[in-house]
Curated annotation (Swiss-Prot):
Listed name of the protein: Nucleoprotein
Encoding gene, per UniProt annotation: NP
Subcellular location(s) per record: Virion; Host nucleus
One Pfam assignment: Flu_NP
GO molecular function, one term: RNA binding
Originating species: Influenza A virus (strain A/Swine/Tennessee/24/1977 H1N1)
GO biological process, one term: viral penetration into host nucleus
Amino acid sequence: MASQGTKRSYEQMETGGERQDATEIRASVGRMIGGIGRFYIQMCTELKLSDYEGRLIQNSITIERMVLSAFDERRNKYLEEHPSAGKDPKKTGGPIYRRVDGKWMRELILYDKEEIRRVWRQANNGEDATAGLTHIMIWHSNLNDATYQRTRALVRTGMDPRMCSLMQGSTLPRRSGAAGAAVKGVGTIAMELIRMIKRGINDRNFWRGENGRRTRIAYERMCNILKGKFQTAAQRAMMDQVRESRNPGNAEIEDLIFLARSALILRGSVAHKSCLPACVYGLAVASGHDFEREGYSLVGIDPFKLLQNSQVFSLIRPNENPAHKSQLVWMACHSAAFEDLRVSGFIRGKKVVPRGKLSTRGVQIASNENVEAMDSSTLELRSRYWAIRTRSGGNTNQQKASAGQISVQPTFSVQRNLPFERATVMAAFIGNNEGRTSDMRTEIIRMMESAKPEDLSFQGRGVFELSDEKATNPIVPSFDMNNEGSYFFGDNAEEYDN
Protein backbone atom coordinates (compact mmCIF):
# COMPACT_ATOMS: atom_id res chain seq x y z
CA MET A 1 0.00 0.00 0.00
CA ALA A 2 1.96 2.95 -1.28
CA SER A 3 -0.47 5.51 0.04
CA GLN A 4 -0.21 4.36 3.64
CA GLY A 5 0.71 7.86 4.76
CA THR A 6 -2.61 9.32 3.73
CA LYS A 7 -4.70 6.47 5.04
CA ARG A 8 -6.19 6.68 8.48
CA SER A 9 -6.26 3.44 10.42
CA TYR A 10 -9.68 1.83 10.87
CA GLU A 11 -9.71 2.77 14.44
CA GLN A 12 -9.37 6.40 13.45
CA MET A 13 -12.20 6.03 10.97
CA GLU A 14 -14.07 4.19 13.65
CA THR A 15 -13.76 7.07 16.10
CA GLY A 16 -13.76 9.95 13.63
CA GLY A 17 -10.39 10.86 15.09
CA GLU A 18 -7.48 12.85 13.77
CA ARG A 19 -4.02 11.29 13.68
CA GLN A 20 -3.52 9.57 17.00
CA ASP A 21 -0.88 7.27 18.33
CA ALA A 22 -1.66 3.66 19.16
CA THR A 23 -2.48 4.35 22.81
CA GLU A 24 -4.89 7.15 21.96
CA ILE A 25 -6.57 5.00 19.34
CA ARG A 26 -6.95 2.14 21.82
CA ALA A 27 -8.43 4.57 24.33
CA SER A 28 -10.92 6.13 21.91
CA VAL A 29 -12.07 2.73 20.63
CA GLY A 30 -12.36 1.68 24.28
CA ARG A 31 -14.46 4.75 25.00
CA MET A 32 -16.78 3.82 22.14
CA ILE A 33 -17.15 0.20 23.36
CA GLY A 34 -17.69 1.32 26.96
CA GLY A 35 -20.45 3.66 25.79
CA ILE A 36 -22.26 0.80 24.06
CA GLY A 37 -21.93 -1.29 27.22
CA ARG A 38 -23.25 1.44 29.52
CA PHE A 39 -26.17 2.07 27.18
CA TYR A 40 -27.03 -1.63 27.19
CA ILE A 41 -26.98 -1.87 31.00
CA GLN A 42 -29.26 1.17 31.28
CA MET A 43 -31.72 -0.25 28.73
CA CYS A 44 -31.85 -3.56 30.61
CA THR A 45 -32.68 -1.61 33.77
CA GLU A 46 -35.41 0.39 32.02
CA LEU A 47 -36.91 -2.77 30.53
CA LYS A 48 -36.54 -4.64 33.84
CA LEU A 49 -34.67 -7.51 32.20
CA SER A 50 -33.20 -10.17 34.46
CA ASP A 51 -29.51 -10.98 34.16
CA TYR A 52 -30.35 -14.05 32.07
CA GLU A 53 -32.72 -12.12 29.79
CA GLY A 54 -30.10 -9.42 29.32
CA ARG A 55 -27.66 -12.04 28.03
CA LEU A 56 -30.11 -13.27 25.40
CA ILE A 57 -28.74 -12.35 21.99
CA GLN A 58 -32.25 -11.79 20.58
CA ASN A 59 -32.90 -9.13 23.25
CA SER A 60 -29.54 -7.56 22.50
CA ILE A 61 -30.42 -7.30 18.80
CA THR A 62 -33.80 -5.69 19.55
CA ILE A 63 -32.17 -3.06 21.78
CA GLU A 64 -29.46 -2.44 19.16
CA ARG A 65 -32.05 -2.00 16.42
CA MET A 66 -34.03 0.42 18.56
CA VAL A 67 -31.07 2.75 19.04
CA LEU A 68 -30.17 2.60 15.34
CA SER A 69 -33.75 3.44 14.49
CA ALA A 70 -33.83 6.31 17.01
CA PHE A 71 -30.83 7.93 15.32
CA ASP A 72 -31.83 7.27 11.72
CA GLU A 73 -32.53 10.91 10.92
CA ARG A 74 -33.36 10.47 7.27
CA ARG A 75 -35.91 7.76 7.93
CA ASN A 76 -37.36 9.63 10.91
CA LYS A 77 -37.87 12.70 8.73
CA TYR A 78 -39.43 10.57 5.99
CA LEU A 79 -41.81 8.92 8.47
CA GLU A 80 -42.94 12.28 9.78
CA GLU A 81 -43.60 13.61 6.27
CA HIS A 82 -45.32 10.42 5.03
CA PRO A 83 -47.42 9.24 7.95
CA SER A 84 -48.49 5.63 7.45
CA ALA A 85 -51.32 3.95 9.29
CA GLY A 86 -50.36 2.35 12.57
CA LYS A 87 -46.78 3.66 12.57
CA ASP A 88 -45.87 6.27 15.12
CA PRO A 89 -42.82 8.10 13.70
CA LYS A 90 -41.74 9.10 17.20
CA LYS A 91 -41.66 5.58 18.58
CA THR A 92 -39.53 2.53 18.00
CA GLY A 93 -39.64 -0.95 19.45
CA GLY A 94 -39.40 -4.64 18.87
CA PRO A 95 -39.74 -8.04 20.52
CA ILE A 96 -38.33 -8.55 24.01
CA TYR A 97 -38.18 -12.13 25.25
CA ARG A 98 -38.82 -12.88 28.90
CA ARG A 99 -38.66 -16.06 30.91
CA VAL A 100 -42.06 -16.60 32.58
CA ASP A 101 -42.87 -19.79 34.54
CA GLY A 102 -40.14 -21.76 32.81
CA LYS A 103 -41.25 -20.70 29.31
CA TRP A 104 -40.08 -17.99 26.95
CA MET A 105 -42.64 -15.29 26.16
CA ARG A 106 -42.47 -12.56 23.54
CA GLU A 107 -43.47 -9.04 24.52
CA LEU A 108 -43.66 -6.28 21.91
CA ILE A 109 -42.41 -3.03 23.39
CA LEU A 110 -42.70 0.55 22.16
CA TYR A 111 -40.39 3.32 23.24
CA ASP A 112 -40.03 7.02 22.53
CA LYS A 113 -37.10 7.55 20.19
CA GLU A 114 -36.32 10.71 22.15
CA GLU A 115 -36.02 8.68 25.35
CA ILE A 116 -33.65 6.18 23.69
CA ARG A 117 -31.52 9.01 22.30
CA ARG A 118 -31.34 10.41 25.82
CA VAL A 119 -30.17 7.10 27.31
CA TRP A 120 -27.61 6.66 24.51
CA ARG A 121 -26.17 10.17 24.90
CA GLN A 122 -26.06 9.79 28.67
CA ALA A 123 -24.04 6.58 28.28
CA ASN A 124 -21.70 8.36 25.86
CA ASN A 125 -20.80 11.46 27.90
CA GLY A 126 -23.54 13.51 26.33
CA GLU A 127 -22.33 12.97 22.77
CA ASP A 128 -24.13 11.45 19.78
CA ALA A 129 -21.33 8.86 19.55
CA THR A 130 -21.93 8.01 15.90
CA ALA A 131 -18.89 5.72 15.95
CA GLY A 132 -20.71 3.45 18.41
CA LEU A 133 -23.78 3.40 16.18
CA THR A 134 -21.67 2.45 13.16
CA HIS A 135 -20.05 -0.29 15.22
CA ILE A 136 -23.49 -1.77 15.95
CA MET A 137 -24.36 -1.53 12.23
CA ILE A 138 -21.22 -3.46 11.33
CA TRP A 139 -22.10 -6.20 13.84
CA HIS A 140 -25.55 -6.51 12.22
CA SER A 141 -23.96 -6.53 8.78
CA ASN A 142 -21.51 -9.28 9.79
CA LEU A 143 -24.40 -11.31 11.17
CA ASN A 144 -26.29 -10.92 7.88
CA ASP A 145 -23.18 -11.88 5.90
CA ALA A 146 -22.90 -15.13 7.85
CA THR A 147 -26.63 -15.88 7.78
CA TYR A 148 -28.02 -15.04 4.36
CA GLN A 149 -27.08 -15.39 0.75
CA ARG A 150 -27.37 -12.49 -1.66
CA THR A 151 -27.91 -14.54 -4.80
CA ARG A 152 -30.90 -12.54 -5.95
CA ALA A 153 -29.18 -9.20 -5.44
CA LEU A 154 -26.11 -10.44 -7.35
CA VAL A 155 -28.16 -11.75 -10.24
CA ARG A 156 -30.21 -8.56 -10.43
CA THR A 157 -27.11 -6.47 -11.03
CA GLY A 158 -25.73 -8.93 -13.57
CA MET A 159 -23.14 -10.55 -11.31
CA ASP A 160 -22.59 -14.23 -10.67
CA PRO A 161 -23.93 -15.66 -7.37
CA ARG A 162 -20.67 -17.51 -6.90
CA MET A 163 -18.99 -14.15 -6.39
CA CYS A 164 -20.49 -14.01 -2.91
CA SER A 165 -17.05 -13.64 -1.27
CA LEU A 166 -16.99 -10.07 -2.61
CA MET A 167 -20.26 -9.12 -0.94
CA GLN A 168 -19.16 -8.29 2.60
CA GLY A 169 -21.19 -5.46 4.10
CA SER A 170 -23.88 -5.58 1.42
CA THR A 171 -26.62 -4.86 3.98
CA LEU A 172 -24.84 -1.95 5.68
CA PRO A 173 -26.90 1.24 5.64
CA ARG A 174 -25.65 4.15 3.55
CA ARG A 175 -25.09 6.25 6.65
CA SER A 176 -22.36 3.99 8.01
CA GLY A 177 -19.58 6.43 7.07
CA ALA A 178 -15.88 5.74 6.53
CA ALA A 179 -15.77 2.84 8.97
CA GLY A 180 -18.63 1.23 7.05
CA ALA A 181 -16.95 1.81 3.67
CA ALA A 182 -13.76 0.14 4.95
CA VAL A 183 -15.53 -3.17 5.61
CA LYS A 184 -17.49 -3.27 2.35
CA GLY A 185 -16.38 -5.83 -0.19
CA VAL A 186 -15.50 -5.00 -3.80
CA GLY A 187 -18.76 -6.57 -5.02
CA THR A 188 -20.85 -4.54 -2.58
CA ILE A 189 -19.53 -1.21 -3.83
CA ALA A 190 -19.62 -2.32 -7.47
CA MET A 191 -23.26 -3.25 -6.93
CA GLU A 192 -24.10 0.15 -5.39
CA LEU A 193 -22.49 1.86 -8.39
CA ILE A 194 -24.34 -0.36 -10.88
CA ARG A 195 -27.63 0.50 -9.19
CA MET A 196 -26.85 4.21 -9.53
CA ILE A 197 -25.94 3.85 -13.21
CA LYS A 198 -29.13 1.87 -13.90
CA ARG A 199 -31.21 4.61 -12.32
CA GLY A 200 -29.41 7.13 -14.50
CA ILE A 201 -30.22 5.10 -17.61
CA ASN A 202 -33.92 4.91 -16.72
CA ASP A 203 -34.36 8.43 -15.39
CA ARG A 204 -32.83 11.19 -17.49
CA ASN A 205 -33.02 13.71 -14.67
CA PHE A 206 -30.98 11.55 -12.32
CA TRP A 207 -27.69 13.34 -13.12
CA ARG A 208 -29.26 16.76 -13.80
CA GLY A 209 -29.92 19.86 -11.78
CA GLU A 210 -28.86 20.56 -8.20
CA ASN A 211 -29.81 17.06 -7.06
CA GLY A 212 -27.93 15.55 -9.96
CA ARG A 213 -24.81 17.42 -8.94
CA ARG A 214 -24.98 15.87 -5.49
CA THR A 215 -25.62 12.48 -7.07
CA ARG A 216 -22.56 12.93 -9.26
CA ILE A 217 -20.38 13.79 -6.25
CA ALA A 218 -21.64 10.66 -4.47
CA TYR A 219 -20.92 8.60 -7.59
CA GLU A 220 -17.35 9.85 -7.86
CA ARG A 221 -16.76 9.41 -4.15
CA MET A 222 -17.95 5.81 -4.34
CA CYS A 223 -15.71 5.20 -7.37
CA ASN A 224 -12.75 6.47 -5.36
CA ILE A 225 -13.58 4.20 -2.44
CA LEU A 226 -13.67 1.22 -4.78
CA LYS A 227 -10.47 2.33 -6.52
CA GLY A 228 -8.77 2.49 -3.12
CA LYS A 229 -9.61 -1.15 -2.48
CA PHE A 230 -7.84 -2.39 -5.61
CA GLN A 231 -4.17 -3.22 -5.35
CA THR A 232 -3.06 -3.22 -9.00
CA ALA A 233 -2.47 -0.24 -11.27
CA ALA A 234 -4.60 -1.61 -14.10
CA GLN A 235 -7.64 -2.12 -11.88
CA ARG A 236 -7.22 1.39 -10.50
CA ALA A 237 -6.85 2.90 -13.97
CA MET A 238 -10.04 1.20 -15.02
CA MET A 239 -11.81 2.71 -12.01
CA ASP A 240 -10.59 6.16 -13.11
CA GLN A 241 -12.29 5.52 -16.45
CA VAL A 242 -15.55 4.57 -14.75
CA ARG A 243 -15.36 7.63 -12.51
CA GLU A 244 -14.58 10.12 -15.29
CA SER A 245 -17.29 8.91 -17.66
CA ARG A 246 -19.44 11.90 -18.74
CA ASN A 247 -22.59 9.87 -18.91
CA PRO A 248 -22.29 6.51 -17.14
CA GLY A 249 -24.15 3.71 -18.91
CA ASN A 250 -23.88 0.07 -19.94
CA ALA A 251 -20.17 0.29 -20.77
CA GLU A 252 -19.48 1.32 -17.17
CA ILE A 253 -21.70 -1.47 -15.84
CA GLU A 254 -19.70 -3.96 -17.94
CA ASP A 255 -16.45 -2.52 -16.60
CA LEU A 256 -17.64 -2.76 -13.00
CA ILE A 257 -18.75 -6.37 -13.40
CA PHE A 258 -15.40 -7.14 -15.03
CA LEU A 259 -13.53 -5.48 -12.15
CA ALA A 260 -15.62 -7.27 -9.53
CA ARG A 261 -14.85 -10.60 -11.20
CA SER A 262 -11.17 -9.77 -11.40
CA ALA A 263 -11.20 -9.25 -7.63
CA LEU A 264 -11.80 -12.99 -7.16
CA ILE A 265 -8.13 -13.45 -8.05
CA LEU A 266 -6.57 -9.98 -7.74
CA ARG A 267 -8.21 -9.33 -4.39
CA GLY A 268 -9.16 -5.97 -3.02
CA SER A 269 -8.36 -4.68 0.47
CA VAL A 270 -11.36 -5.14 2.70
CA ALA A 271 -11.18 -4.43 6.40
CA HIS A 272 -12.32 -6.93 9.00
CA LYS A 273 -13.26 -6.04 12.53
CA SER A 274 -14.67 -8.09 15.34
CA CYS A 275 -17.87 -6.33 16.36
CA LEU A 276 -19.72 -8.06 19.18
CA PRO A 277 -23.35 -7.86 20.31
CA ALA A 278 -24.05 -5.00 22.73
CA CYS A 279 -24.86 -7.43 25.56
CA VAL A 280 -21.24 -8.66 25.56
CA TYR A 281 -19.95 -5.14 26.14
CA GLY A 282 -22.69 -4.60 28.73
CA LEU A 283 -21.63 -7.70 30.67
CA ALA A 284 -18.00 -6.57 30.70
CA VAL A 285 -18.85 -3.05 31.88
CA ALA A 286 -21.18 -4.46 34.54
CA SER A 287 -18.38 -6.64 35.87
CA GLY A 288 -16.21 -3.56 36.32
CA HIS A 289 -14.14 -3.54 33.13
CA ASP A 290 -13.00 -0.01 32.22
CA PHE A 291 -12.65 -0.11 28.43
CA GLU A 292 -11.31 3.40 28.07
CA ARG A 293 -8.58 2.91 30.66
CA GLU A 294 -7.59 -0.54 29.42
CA GLY A 295 -7.89 0.41 25.76
CA TYR A 296 -9.45 -1.82 23.12
CA SER A 297 -8.79 -2.88 19.55
CA LEU A 298 -11.26 -4.41 17.11
CA VAL A 299 -8.53 -6.17 15.17
CA GLY A 300 -6.38 -7.67 17.92
CA ILE A 301 -6.75 -10.05 20.86
CA ASP A 302 -9.33 -7.96 22.78
CA PRO A 303 -12.54 -9.32 21.23
CA PHE A 304 -11.24 -12.88 21.66
CA LYS A 305 -10.52 -12.27 25.35
CA LEU A 306 -13.94 -10.70 25.80
CA LEU A 307 -15.67 -13.72 24.25
CA GLN A 308 -13.56 -16.15 26.32
CA ASN A 309 -15.36 -15.07 29.46
CA SER A 310 -18.80 -13.93 28.31
CA GLN A 311 -21.83 -16.12 28.57
CA VAL A 312 -24.41 -15.29 25.91
CA PHE A 313 -27.61 -17.25 25.34
CA SER A 314 -29.77 -17.71 22.28
CA LEU A 315 -33.27 -18.97 21.67
CA ILE A 316 -33.14 -22.24 19.75
CA ARG A 317 -35.98 -23.49 17.53
CA PRO A 318 -37.10 -27.08 18.13
CA ASN A 319 -35.12 -28.65 15.27
CA GLU A 320 -32.00 -26.49 15.40
CA ASN A 321 -28.55 -27.59 16.48
CA PRO A 322 -27.17 -25.32 19.25
CA ALA A 323 -23.57 -26.00 18.15
CA HIS A 324 -24.45 -24.78 14.66
CA LYS A 325 -26.12 -21.67 16.06
CA SER A 326 -22.92 -21.01 17.98
CA GLN A 327 -20.81 -21.35 14.84
CA LEU A 328 -23.02 -18.85 13.01
CA VAL A 329 -22.67 -16.25 15.77
CA TRP A 330 -18.93 -16.92 16.19
CA MET A 331 -18.40 -16.27 12.49
CA ALA A 332 -20.46 -13.09 12.70
CA CYS A 333 -18.52 -11.86 15.74
CA HIS A 334 -15.23 -12.16 13.87
CA SER A 335 -16.47 -11.03 10.47
CA ALA A 336 -15.44 -14.41 9.08
CA ALA A 337 -18.31 -15.23 6.71
CA PHE A 338 -16.02 -15.33 3.68
CA GLU A 339 -12.94 -16.73 5.38
CA ASP A 340 -11.53 -20.14 4.54
CA LEU A 341 -13.27 -22.62 6.84
CA ARG A 342 -10.02 -24.41 7.58
CA VAL A 343 -8.52 -21.23 8.99
CA SER A 344 -11.64 -20.39 11.01
CA GLY A 345 -11.82 -23.96 12.29
CA PHE A 346 -8.18 -23.96 13.37
CA ILE A 347 -8.55 -20.69 15.27
CA ARG A 348 -11.83 -21.70 16.82
CA GLY A 349 -10.51 -25.13 17.74
CA LYS A 350 -13.70 -26.78 16.49
CA LYS A 351 -14.69 -28.02 13.09
CA VAL A 352 -16.43 -25.29 11.14
CA VAL A 353 -18.96 -26.64 8.65
CA PRO A 354 -20.18 -25.04 5.41
CA ARG A 355 -23.44 -23.20 5.62
CA GLY A 356 -25.35 -25.75 3.56
CA LYS A 357 -24.69 -28.29 6.33
CA LEU A 358 -25.79 -26.06 9.22
CA SER A 359 -29.00 -27.09 10.96
CA THR A 360 -29.87 -23.60 12.05
CA ARG A 361 -31.75 -20.65 10.65
CA GLY A 362 -30.96 -17.03 11.44
CA VAL A 363 -30.66 -15.64 14.96
CA GLN A 364 -33.65 -13.33 14.73
CA ILE A 365 -37.10 -14.76 15.28
CA ALA A 366 -40.09 -13.81 13.15
CA SER A 367 -43.19 -12.43 14.83
CA ASN A 368 -45.30 -15.41 13.74
CA GLU A 369 -43.05 -18.06 15.30
CA ASN A 370 -44.13 -19.77 18.47
CA VAL A 371 -41.64 -18.81 21.16
CA GLU A 372 -43.13 -21.04 23.86
CA ALA A 373 -41.90 -24.09 21.98
CA MET A 374 -38.34 -22.75 22.10
CA ASP A 375 -35.55 -23.39 24.50
CA SER A 376 -32.49 -21.31 25.11
CA SER A 377 -28.92 -22.49 25.15
CA THR A 378 -25.47 -21.03 25.75
CA LEU A 379 -23.62 -19.89 22.64
CA GLU A 380 -20.11 -21.33 22.52
CA LEU A 381 -18.14 -18.29 21.35
CA ARG A 382 -14.72 -19.18 22.73
CA SER A 383 -11.67 -19.84 20.59
CA ARG A 384 -8.56 -21.99 20.83
CA TYR A 385 -6.21 -19.37 19.31
CA TRP A 386 -6.47 -15.77 18.22
CA ALA A 387 -5.24 -14.03 15.10
CA ILE A 388 -4.95 -10.48 13.88
CA ARG A 389 -7.73 -9.40 11.53
CA THR A 390 -6.51 -8.37 8.12
CA ARG A 391 -7.33 -5.38 5.96
CA SER A 392 -5.70 -6.67 2.80
CA GLY A 393 -7.08 -9.18 0.37
CA GLY A 394 -3.77 -10.98 0.18
CA ASN A 395 -3.16 -12.82 -3.01
CA THR A 396 -3.96 -16.13 -4.31
CA ASN A 397 -2.64 -19.21 -5.76
CA GLN A 398 -4.04 -22.09 -7.62
CA GLN A 399 -6.06 -24.29 -5.49
CA LYS A 400 -9.34 -26.04 -5.35
CA ALA A 401 -12.23 -23.96 -4.28
CA SER A 402 -15.79 -25.07 -4.46
CA ALA A 403 -18.91 -25.01 -6.54
CA GLY A 404 -20.86 -22.57 -4.40
CA GLN A 405 -18.18 -19.98 -3.73
CA ILE A 406 -15.18 -19.67 -6.01
CA SER A 407 -12.89 -17.60 -3.85
CA VAL A 408 -12.35 -16.50 -0.25
CA GLN A 409 -11.77 -13.10 1.34
CA PRO A 410 -9.33 -13.61 4.22
CA THR A 411 -10.35 -12.33 7.65
CA PHE A 412 -7.43 -13.50 9.72
CA SER A 413 -3.84 -12.60 9.01
CA VAL A 414 -2.67 -16.20 8.79
CA GLN A 415 -0.18 -17.48 6.26
CA ARG A 416 -1.72 -19.93 3.78
CA ASN A 417 -2.65 -20.53 0.19
CA LEU A 418 -5.90 -18.93 -0.83
CA PRO A 419 -8.24 -21.17 -2.75
CA PHE A 420 -9.89 -20.11 -5.94
CA GLU A 421 -11.13 -22.02 -8.92
CA ARG A 422 -9.06 -20.59 -11.76
CA ALA A 423 -10.90 -22.37 -14.57
CA THR A 424 -14.26 -21.12 -13.33
CA VAL A 425 -13.09 -17.58 -12.75
CA MET A 426 -11.26 -17.30 -16.07
CA ALA A 427 -14.17 -18.76 -18.06
CA ALA A 428 -16.08 -15.60 -17.23
CA PHE A 429 -13.55 -13.47 -19.09
CA ILE A 430 -14.05 -14.86 -22.57
CA GLY A 431 -15.69 -12.44 -24.94
CA ASN A 432 -16.02 -8.69 -24.81
CA ASN A 433 -12.58 -7.17 -24.86
CA GLU A 434 -12.78 -4.05 -26.97
CA GLY A 435 -13.56 -0.43 -26.33
CA ARG A 436 -11.82 2.18 -24.25
CA THR A 437 -10.69 -0.12 -21.47
CA SER A 438 -9.37 -2.92 -23.66
CA ASP A 439 -5.69 -2.46 -22.79
CA MET A 440 -6.45 -2.42 -19.07
CA ARG A 441 -8.67 -5.47 -19.41
CA THR A 442 -5.92 -7.30 -21.27
CA GLU A 443 -3.43 -6.39 -18.56
CA ILE A 444 -5.77 -7.52 -15.77
CA ILE A 445 -6.49 -10.83 -17.50
CA ARG A 446 -2.75 -11.34 -18.01
CA MET A 447 -2.12 -10.81 -14.30
CA MET A 448 -4.88 -13.22 -13.39
CA GLU A 449 -3.60 -15.90 -15.74
CA SER A 450 -0.10 -15.65 -14.40
CA ALA A 451 -1.21 -15.86 -10.76
CA LYS A 452 1.45 -18.32 -9.59
CA PRO A 453 1.24 -20.42 -6.44
CA GLU A 454 4.46 -19.34 -4.79
CA ASP A 455 4.41 -15.57 -5.09
CA LEU A 456 0.71 -15.19 -4.55
CA SER A 457 -0.14 -16.87 -1.31
CA PHE A 458 -1.39 -14.78 1.58
CA GLN A 459 1.53 -13.66 3.71
CA GLY A 460 0.10 -13.53 7.18
CA ARG A 461 1.53 -13.72 10.66
CA GLY A 462 0.03 -16.94 11.94
CA VAL A 463 -2.17 -17.58 14.96
CA PHE A 464 -1.31 -17.05 18.62
CA GLU A 465 -2.04 -18.71 21.93
CA LEU A 466 -4.58 -16.75 23.97
CA SER A 467 -1.88 -16.28 26.60
CA ASP A 468 0.35 -14.60 24.00
CA GLU A 469 -1.18 -11.12 24.18
CA LYS A 470 1.74 -9.37 22.53
CA ALA A 471 1.68 -11.72 19.52
CA THR A 472 5.29 -12.81 19.97
CA ASN A 473 5.17 -16.49 18.96
CA PRO A 474 3.24 -17.02 15.74
CA ILE A 475 2.06 -20.56 15.10
CA VAL A 476 1.70 -21.18 11.36
CA PRO A 477 -0.97 -23.83 10.97
CA SER A 478 -0.79 -26.37 8.20
CA PHE A 479 -4.05 -27.09 6.45
CA ASP A 480 -5.31 -30.13 4.68
CA MET A 481 -5.74 -28.57 1.28
CA ASN A 482 -7.89 -31.35 -0.13
CA ASN A 483 -10.75 -30.37 2.08
CA GLU A 484 -13.50 -28.00 1.20
CA GLY A 485 -12.60 -24.45 2.20
CA SER A 486 -15.62 -22.34 1.55
CA TYR A 487 -18.60 -21.69 3.72
CA PHE A 488 -21.11 -21.08 0.95
CA PHE A 489 -20.49 -24.43 -0.69
CA GLY A 490 -23.67 -26.28 -1.72
CA ASP A 491 -25.63 -23.47 -0.23
CA ASN A 492 -29.26 -23.61 0.77
CA ALA A 493 -29.59 -20.64 3.09
CA GLU A 494 -32.41 -18.14 3.07
CA GLU A 495 -32.20 -15.03 0.94
CA TYR A 496 -31.67 -11.74 2.70
CA ASP A 497 -34.87 -9.71 2.51
CA ASN A 498 -35.06 -6.25 3.92
